Amino acid sequence: MNKIFAAFKPRGLSSNAFLSTLKKKYKNKKAGYSGTLDPFAKGVLIVAFGQYTKLFRFLKKTPKTYKATLWLGVYSLSLDDQNIKEIKNIKEFDLPNLQQIIDQMQGIISYTPPQFSAKRINGTRAYELAKKGIEVNLKPCQMEVFDCKILSYNHPFLNIEITVSEGAYIRSYCELFARKLGINATLSSLERIKEGKFVYNNEKSLNVLKYINLKPNFIKDLNKLENGAKIFVEELEFHDKGDYYIETEKYFSIINIKENTVKYLLNKVEKC
C-alpha cells in the first residue's frame, strides 16, 4: 500500500512510538515519517507507507507553522512544563512591548538547540540523553522566522503563532524571547499546525505529486518508464540539470539530469 498523509501526533508519545501505532492501525510494517516531534510537542507529522517512504527528501516541507504558549517567569531545564526549577510571579507586560520584541525577532536568528530536543547526537536523540543527565555540546545553529503573531496574552501565558524554517526550535525562540524581556520563560504547550503544505485532515490520503518539490518532465515513449529502460536527454522535453518527475497513468518516476545524462532516482512508483 502506497499512502502519504498528515497525521496528528499526540503529546506524550515519541514520533517513533506514534508511528508504531499507525503501523498496527494500517497493518503495514513499511512506514516512515519526516519532521520529528519530540514527546512534549503535538501536531502534524508527515507519514508515508510503502514506496512513498522513499519520497521524503523530495517533499516540500517548509515553512513550518506552530502554535505555542509561553509561560512567563518560569525556569525549566527542558524549556517546557517538565523539569521546572523555579516559578516567579512577575509583573504583567504591556502588549505593545511584547509586540515590539516579536517584531525584532524576525528573519535569521542564531541560537543553540536545547538539550531537550529531537536533534541526534551520534544516533541518539538529545532529549533521551538529557533525561539521563548526560550533558551534550550542541553546535550553534540558525533559524529563520518568517512570521510571528500574538494570538492572546493572559498573563503569565502568551499564545503565539510562528512560521519558521526547517530545523528551527521553538523552545530556543522562547528562550531568546524571554532573554530580551529580562526574565525566564518556558513553553507550556507546542503544536505544529502546518508543515509545508501538509495540514492535518483526518489522515486523508494525499496525491503525492502535489506535494513533491520537483518540476514535471515529459517523454513521448512512456513505455521506457514502464520497462525502466535507459532514457536519453534528447527524448525529454526539458534538458536543464536537476531532478524531475515523469508520470504515466498508473506510475511515476523521479529522474536526475546531470552532464547530459539521465539517471533514475526512483522508478515506477505506483500512484495511490
Curated annotation (Swiss-Prot):
Broad enzyme group: isomerase
Entry's Gene Ontology BP terms: mRNA pseudouridine synthesis; tRNA pseudouridine synthesis
NAD recorded as keyword: no
Keywords: Isomerase, tRNA processing
EC code(s) of this entry: 5.4.99.25
GO molecular function ontology, one term from the record: RNA binding
Entry-linked Pfam families: TruB_N (PF01509)
Active site residues per record: 38 (nucleophile)
SUPFAM superfamilies associated with the record: Pseudouridine synthase
Catalysis: reaction(s): uridine(55) in tRNA = pseudouridine(55) in tRNA
Function: Responsible for synthesis of pseudouridine from uracil-55 in the psi GC loop of transfer RNAs.
Protein family per UniProt: Belongs to the pseudouridine synthase TruB family. Type 1 subfamily.
Protein name in the entry: tRNA pseudouridine synthase B
